[in-house]
C-alpha cells in the first residue's frame, strides 16, 4: 500500500534516506516534498510519535538530515532544506493517521471522481481494512459514513477546530514542551497552518 508521505520518485528516494535518520532520533517523517523553483526546496515535516515537536528539535533533525544527504548526495542542484512540524491542521499522510485522529474533522481529496465528486469534508471515523472512513453530510438522510480506499487519496488534512486546538495543547503539555504564548492568536489564524514549529532554512 502506498502513502502520501512522499509522492514522486525523487521524493520516495529522499524519504528512504532521511526516514532512518529521523526515526533513529525518536521522531516520525510525516511528509516530504522536493519543490521546484529558482532554488529547489526540500520540505520535511516531522513529529514526535505522540505529537508536540518544537523548533529546537526541528533544528536537530535538520542538522542530522543535512549530514545524511551530504553523504548520499541525491539532489544535483543547490537546494534549501526546511524542517517543520505538521502544524495544527496537519496533513494526514499514513493510514494510521486516520485512526489516531478519529472524531476530528478533515478534508479529503481523491485522485478520481467518487460518485461524481473528488472532495469530501466530514468527521473521521477511523479505518476498516484499507479504507478510510469519514462521516459526511447527506442531503437525504442527514449524515452517512462512507469508506474511501487509502490508495484513492490525493490529499487529506485536518480542519482547524476548537476541539483540535485543545488536543494539540494537551499534547504539548504532555510532552513538556508547552509554550502558551504560541497559542495566543490561534483562533485569529483559523484556516491557516497555525502553530507550525519550523527550523530556519538551511542552504546546500
From Swiss-Prot:
Any idea what this protein is called?
A: Ribosome maturation factor RimP
Region described as Disordered: spans on this chain: 176-204
Alphabetized Pfam families for the sequence: DUF150_C (PF17384), RimP_N (PF02576)
Q: Which GO terms describe its biological process?
A: ribosomal small subunit assembly; translation
Q: Which domain of life is it from?
A: Bacteria
Q: Which UniProt keywords apply?
A: Cytoplasm, Ribosome biogenesis
Q: Which family does it belong to?
A: Belongs to the RimP family.
- Tell where it localizes: Cytoplasm
Provide the species name: Cereibacter sphaeroides (strain KD131 / KCTC 12085)
- One GO term describing the cellular component: cytosol
The upper taxonomy is: Bacteria, Pseudomonadati, Pseudomonadota, Alphaproteobacteria, Rhodobacterales
Compositional bias of kind Acidic residues: 181-198
Task: Report the function annotation for this chain.
Answer: Required for maturation of 30S ribosomal subunits.
Report if keyword Magnesium is assigned.
no
